[in-house]
Amino acid sequence: MSKQNNRIIPTNRDKKICRKCGYHVCSDHYVANLNKHHEIIKNHNDKINRVNMNDIINIKLLFHILLPRDSFNKDKVISRTHDIVCSLNDDFNNYSSNTNTMNNSKYKNIIKQIFGANTIKQGIYLSSDYQKIIPEKSSNIVFELGEIYYYPVKHKLNLSKYDDISDVESQRHEIEQYVRSSEAGAYEPKKFVNIWIIDMIDTSILGFSNFPWEVVNSCHGIIANRRCFFPEEYGESNYSSFKTFTHHMGHHLGLLHVYNPNHCQSKSCDSSGGSKSIVLDFIIDPLDKINNKKLHIDKEYNPYFTNFMDFTCDKYVSNFTVRQIQEMRFMINKFKPKLNSLLNESQCPIPKYNPETDTISATINFNQRFSNREGSAVPSYEKADNPRMSASQGMINPEIFMGIADPQQPFLKPTVVPTNKNINDLIPNLCGTTLPTRKSGNTQDQIIENIQNVLPSSYMNSEQPKDAYADFKKKYNIIYSEDSYIINHPHNPYLLQQHHQDISAMQQQILEEKNQLRRATIDVPVCGNPYNAGQTVGHYVPPINPEEIDRFNAKRQFAESFNPEMFRPNDPLMYQSPQVDPSCCQKPMDPRLYRPAVPSDPRMGQYMTDPRLFQNGNQTQYQSNPQSNPQFNHQAYSQPNPQAYPQSNPQMYPQQTTFPPRYDPRMNNPYASRATSNGLSPNNVVQQYQSYYDNPSNQQSNQQSNQQSNQQPNQQPNQQPNQQPNQQPNQQSVQQCNQVNQEALNDLRSRNIKASPTVSPGDLINKMNRVNEQLQNIKSSLQQDPDTSTTTRVNTAVGQRSFGVPRVSNDQSKPKFNKFGQPITNSPFVSGNVASTAMSGKITKENISVNPRDASKAPKSRFQRTKPPQAV
């Protein structure tokens, strides 16, 4: 643990030397970009030498602060970002033809300070060979502070488990994952330069950066350590002038580290005991004559250590070279043309997180969606004039406030349309290049000639090299040979992407060759009208896509394996097996698989047999051939053909079992005779005869439907044709069923009763039965005792029926319990009083017998208490 400037910095190991950049010659990522850089320079060397150096390129910087909330001050962060912007502008633009001013003068002072009395070394570094590579004018690349964004980070990034040299790629991936987890992704990396300030511990690397030709992702930009952003907190003196940001900005704009013949031995790898140790040889402090003895003694060793792209500490670097400035401007124009905010308007979103209040604020209105800073010039450390001062920042348009103050005034401006414009000026530029000189005149020939001059050339006229495929294949074999770089570095991201592109290009080339061979074997139609007599036209077949062939083969295989028997609605193949035993096919199918032909009798169960089907030999009509029934002619009800599956094994499938007939359980009910005596069924009889009663004209159609229902096939396939079914004790005959139906029909029509759909059939039947018995008791009492008053006899008869016999309900079998969990039995007592009929002794066999002596044992109300028995 160490304490610097009242800030505790935890550390697990000693870091001897800090390094500006994580890239070095042993990094796979850097070597891949090194090859890409050399390829770009080789292909565009002429364009780089002729690049325009006078146009101003204005670049906006976005700072993403990923620091713990209590470890920094917001005002200090704003001040430090302005210092970094000033340092970048000075390093890129403070150059002059006068060698005694600006960075030119700074270079001389550094050489004199390092070598002192060593005039030989001073003469080498101050010679014309070194002086001519220093720029004599500004690069005209200006930097501007766009916006600062804060993120609620709770912890620092610990990189103690990685080595700073051998695990540099793993460190980079860990940092990118930390940025993504903090939801601090890059904002429009093609229009802005995103810079992340991260609090890293246990690492000596000060930053990473992306090259302009790399794939743009959420971490595309510059990643800087807090050590180079707040160097005073760490007591850092070697990297306190913010030249680390200049170094990484050069990487981000396409520059590499400075290499010359003196740096060819800058990498040394010593292998011992199966482990590899990497030692990097670079100059950090040129005044250190012990570690840099060769620099002060050897006349042939003269590295260019004052360049910003070297690893030298901040106080000994001073300039770029002319070639480096040309490369940076070319990379911006080629890979990031939208980075210039002067040509492409770009607005930065306002920050939402406030680190002082630890809150996230949303957008207030449309005017505050983007940041609009004051248009003041960027300050500089130098007093000399600089072209960057001409770059102005965006300001709020005053017309917006005028429109808000006066909403009736529209924001429309009259557009000036020139009149009598020459028609040749309206011809669009379709070729995308400099337009040729157009001829004046409005004649038809001149207009057509001007239009033809601006038409783009056809791409079919461009000649392709004949041996392009051979060169590509030769290059591919060289790159992917056993001694190539990609074999030794398989995890190179750039080469891995290039490998996939090469493979896809080769596959496309092979496919095109196959299509050409196919077209060569097919007669191509000749020019002219193919319908003319005597003209032969060959049949042209276009090339077939391999994906279409695969889809066609898949459809053909599915069609061959498709079995239509599997998709029948009631086919047993859907639930038994793909094949059916032929022995089972000879028998009729299970009747449960058929759709019922007529509605079953409501007094019977689901699988109960209607006795009317056995009358007059109706079951023999379709017993021998059930398929003869016209109702089963549909394909869904047809029997499977046994010859369709000749290879099936009969032992594989069990025999179909025959289910015995099930009878209505209500027939065993002692109250079933009373319930059905009046012709009412507890199921759907009321609803069945309700429709009949509403339309009495349906009586004739009902009789015809009853006659047709007697002709339906039997539901028991194993029953013999001439054999009558066994008569069960509770099973009714056909005459009884018809008689019950007729009685119920007559009873409903005589009473003028319509069943309510909300009343259950069981309750309606019980109520009607009680009413019938009450009427019968009243009639019998009037005949037996004519002297008694009518009111007394009616009350007696009604009370006898109401209180003497318990009511019949559908839930007799369900036990009932009181609130104490005790079972409740049917009792003749009502509210603690014995029924009048029970007390008088007029209880018949139809009613429940009650002993009058038990009246004293009647249960009292639960609100009354009885005294406990006293001991004798």
Curated annotation (Swiss-Prot):
Region (Disordered): 595-736, 844-872
Disulfide bonds: none
Keyword Coiled coil: yes
Compositionally biased residues, Polar residues: 615-659, 670-686
Keywords on record: Coiled coil, Virion
Subcellular location as annotated: Virion
Protein name: Uncharacterized protein R722
